[in-house]
């Protein structure tokens, strides 16, 4: 079996180490309403279409109960829409600062292209958001062959439609000749639902939630423990393989191709 295409996520996988761009904004829009949410809570739905992310936060029992205590009712669709509009406004202003390719990504992409492998991408960002991120990333040397946003398909993750559209545009079939790689639980579900080899990348991921500086300065034993927690989370949610850095991706591809593995 030959791998013909790799479909990458964006924030936390190929750009924005640690996926920090949306994190503070999610926390801020709730804080402004007197409802404090933690970074861990804010990260949990990461990878979803952003309005679905806001909705998922309002459905978390602790957050819903706190909202009900303050406002005397649960969050409404109007509340969700208002928060999402605020989220967009703030995020658009900061996105250009969070579009730098993660270390090693450009080199891996170049190596894949030398092997004739096509490069696709999916995201939880809207097309308007990605117009900003993709433009800035391209200026810094990262540009996949194709990009699909949730706006382009009936629904975003965990549905497989963005992966299917990549497959059609890249001209690759069957789906088990493709790899989906990402940094969130929703990425793992998206890849699995699409019938693709699914890989979770740990360092730089939203699931790990650490900056490069934090990774560098953390006690090695503590860091190893956190890495293993994320690894297990990926596997529990469908990952066929996990890698700590993007540089390990090609060895995963070789395992698939040489051992003639079958997706289960």
Swiss-Prot record:
TM segment ranges: none
Residues of the signal peptide: none
Key words, A-Z: Hydrolase, Magnesium, Metal-binding, Schiff base
EC numbers: 3.11.1.1
Annotated active site: 9, 50
Entry keyword annotation includes Metal-binding: yes
Reactions catalysed, as given in the entry: phosphonoacetaldehyde + H2O = acetaldehyde + phosphate + H(+)
Cofactor info, note text: Binds 1 Mg(2+) ion per subunit.
Function (record text): Involved in phosphonate degradation.
Identification of the protein by name: Phosphonoacetaldehyde hydrolase
Source species: Bacillus anthracis
Gene, per the UniProt record: phnX
